[in-house]
C-alpha cells in the first residue's frame, strides 16, 4: 500500500531533491540559501555567456547570474526575504517564546489516565504488528523477499488479509476491555462504541508502522504496499485516500501518549449509533480531550506542535469518513465478509 503522494519532488531551479516551498517556489535547501544570500547582498550579477548557462544539480554553482534568473523564473520572490534586522528580531522573539515557555503539568487524574491507556496498549496493541507473520503471509510480503521459515503453506493474500484484520480487531477489543472507564459503561454501550471505533483505533495504531520514505506499512518482517490492497480488492481511489491520511498523521511525529489519547477520543464518541448514556460518554471524551491538550502543552515547543490538537481533531473526523468507506469496501469484496464475520459485524 503507498501514500497518496507521488514520491520525492524536484527543485524547480536545479532539479535536486526539494525540501519544500521557499520564497514562493518549490526548491532544495541549496537554492533556498543561494537565493537568500544573493538577494540580501544585492550585488549585480552578469552572465559571461549571454545568459544561456545550464542550471542543474551538478552545474548550479558555475554561473550565479543564470541561477538567480532561474530562481526568479521559478517564482521565487525577493520581497519575501527578511532583512538582516528583521531576521534578528524574529529570532529574538522565538528565543523569548522558548524562554517564557512553562510546561503544563498533568493533574494526578490525567497522569493516571495516560498510564492506564499506555499499559493497556502495551499489553494488547503494542506488539500485535510483529505477530502478523504468524498468519501465513504470501512470500512477496516479506521485506527483501526473504522468507522466514514457516512450517505451513502460505495463505492467499485475501485470506491473510482477513485473518490479520480479525486479529487486530480482537486485540483492540482486549485493549478497550482493559480500560476501567470503558468497563464502567453498560454492555450495550460498550458494544455500540466498539462497533463505531474498533477500525478507527486499528488505523491509529497501524500508523506507527507507516514508513514515510517507502510509503509502506512495515509490520515486523512484512511490508504491505498499496498494490497489496488493490490485489485484495479495495478500490485504488479509497486506498490513496487512506494512505494520504496515514502520511499526514505520521508526519506529526506523535509520541505514544498522544497516539493512545487519540485512540481514546475515538472510542469515547457519544454520537455513535445505539449508545444510551450519551452524557456520561461525552464527559469521558471531554476528560480525554483535555488530557491530550494538556499533554501537548506540556511538551517543549516544537514546530510540529503548532495547532497540533486542532490537526488531530480534523484527522479524527477524516478517519471516521474513511471508516465508513472501509465498511462499504469490505461489503463489496467478493468472499471477504465470510472470511471475517467479526469485522463484518462491526462494519454492519
UniProtKB/Swiss-Prot annotation:
Residue positions where Phosphothreonine is found in the record: 38
Pfam families registered for this protein in UniProt: Hormone_recep, zf-C4
Gene3D superfamilies, per database record: Erythroid Transcription Factor GATA-1, subunit A (3.30.50.10), Retinoid X Receptor (1.10.565.10)
MF annotations from Gene Ontology: nuclear receptor activity; RNA polymerase II cis-regulatory region sequence-specific DNA binding; zinc ion binding
Family: Belongs to the nuclear hormone receptor family. NR1 subfamily.
Subunit structure: Heterodimer of NR1I3 and RXR. Interacts with PSMC4. Interacts with ECT2. Directly interacts with DNAJC7; this complex may also include HSP90. Interacts with CRY1. Interacts with CRY2 in a ligand-dependent manner.
Domain notes: Composed by a short N-terminal domain followed by the DNA binding, hinge, and ligand binding/dimerization domains.
Protein name: Nuclear receptor subfamily 1 group I member 3
Organism: Callorhinus ursinus
